[in-house]
């Protein structure tokens, strides 16, 4: 009986391991190293985390200081997404208009009234 349980448990683990790659939801999923630049401002280095399910995308911008904001939107056929950004407590923070394709991100991010050009590539 104990051996049967082990065989079943090992079989379940092997099944889960085999299906894990199929659980990757969308081609835009991942973390992207982003440089945000605006005239008269220092460049900002941020990390953009993207989660995709179908055409729905959720994203978070992680700043080196430990601050983060989030947003969501629908990915267009041309791989463009736009929407609002919010702080962790739900307070409005800004907006974004990005194109995410082939491991690269380009577009604009508005943070507290300043418009930044954003560009970067997937890091994982």
What does each of the following model-derived ranges do?
Residues 1-2, 17, 106:
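A detector of low-complexity, intrinsically disordered, Ser/Thr/Gly/Pro/Ala-rich segments
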Residues 25-101, 106-124:
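Central antiparallel beta-sheet cores of small beta-barrel/beta-sandwich binding domains
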Residues 8-18:
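Bacterial N-terminal signal peptides
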Residues 1-9:
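Bacterial N-terminal signal peptides that target proteins for export
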């Amino acid at each position: 009986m104990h051996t049967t349980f082990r065989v079943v448990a090992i079989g379940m683990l092997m099944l889960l391991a085999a299906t894990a790659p199929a659980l990757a939801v969308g081609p835009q999923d991942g973390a992207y190293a982003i440089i945000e630049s605006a005239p008269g401002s220092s460049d900002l280095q941020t990390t953009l985390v993207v989660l995709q399910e179908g055409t729905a995308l959720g994203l978070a911008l992680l700043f080196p200081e430990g601050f983060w904001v989030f947003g969501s939107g629908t990915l267009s056929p041309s791989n463009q997404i736009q929407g609002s950004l919010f702080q962790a407590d739900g307070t409005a923070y800004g907006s974004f208009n990005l194109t995410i394709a082939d491991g690269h991100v380009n577009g604009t991010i508005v943070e507290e009234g300043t418009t930044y050009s954003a560009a970067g590539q997937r890091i994982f």
